[in-house]
């Protein structure tokens, strides 16, 4: 049920912004289906789904700091927000580290270094 708890936490995080909530649910759904179809291990699938749910967590702090949701600002500010949330929900350190990396690079298409990254990018389109 950790995934449900994370989705609920992100719904709370984006309270008042239904388009962001709908987007994270869409990206999570696409990533989940693609990951299952690709035959990811249980651990890889969890990491992918967590990343898909929090991938845009940097939008809110980017708006607050820069009055913009530019992808580079999301990549700059998103990892710290993701780490804070995932620690609060007791995710393990290795998962948090990789998810923070993915959040910090999900608008950088020239550095794709794994299937989780590739699927996240594709699900986000």
Where are these regions (language model features)?
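Active-site flanking loop/helix segments enriched in acidic
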Residues: 2-26, 58-68
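Short N-terminal amphipathic alpha-helix/helix-capping patch enriched in small hydrophobics
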Residues: 20-31, 44, 49
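Amphipathic alpha-helices of TPR/Sel1-like and other helical repeat/solenoid scaffolds
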Residues: 27-33, 78, 82
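Short, hydrophobic transmembrane alpha-helix segments
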Residues: 34-39
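Divalent metal-dependent catalytic cores for phosphoryl transfer on phosphate-bearing substrates
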Residues: 40-125
